Amino acid sequence: MRAVVWLMEGTWEACVDAAAGLGLTDVRLVHVLDEDTEAGWEGGPLGLMGRGRRRPDDRPGGGRTGNPLDEAGSGLLAAAAARLGGRPGGAGDPGAGPEVLQLHGRTETAVLDACAGADLLICARDGVRTERGPHSLSKVTRYVVDHAPCAVLLVWPEEVPAGVDLPPAPRT
């Protein structure tokens, strides 16, 4: 069974633990740097024009080398691979741990594209964590859950809220 584990800051540990608990051997760890977050990060230094400093990307060749967002994502993927019991690997790297993908763009599109050919998507609730119900999912997670081309395992990032009354069942 091929599983995709969608990693987000603050919830990734629960997703990796769920994958480990299922004993999955064919795992793809996915982290997405959202285009809006990247645009905000890259646009920030423009507000400092005329301050006499060069941006790191102004060197010849430019590129994303040294981007703190990329570095944080790579660190998250490495930590997740280690927690799963292996070193980061890839599809063509036999003997390595899980395949790791650091993607860029719209989060929902990138995650759904990464699910191509997968049998299972493991993701975590990332909305309101103090209550059960539809608000426990963000809009992006709700979209991914609704449109995933495979089965979805939705996990709580921490203990399930206790003592919360469930809404009445819908009338039929």
Regions found by a protein language model. Give the residues of each.
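Structural motif
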Residues: 6-10, 124-126, 156-158
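Structural beta-alpha unit
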Residues: 10-11, 82-121, 159-172
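A short acidic, glycine-rich active-site loop
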Residues: 51-75, 130
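Small/aliphatic-rich secondary-structure junction motif
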Residues: 1-61, 147, 171-172
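Short, acidic/small-residue loops that bind anionic groups at enzyme active sites
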Residues: 143-157
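Glycine-rich, Arg-bearing micro-motifs that act as flexible, cationic patches
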Residues: 120-146, 161-165
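A short acidic, amphipathic alpha-helical/loop segment
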Residues: 14-19, 110-114, 140
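General small-molecule cofactor/ligand-binding pocket signal
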Residues: 28-30, 99-103, 153-155
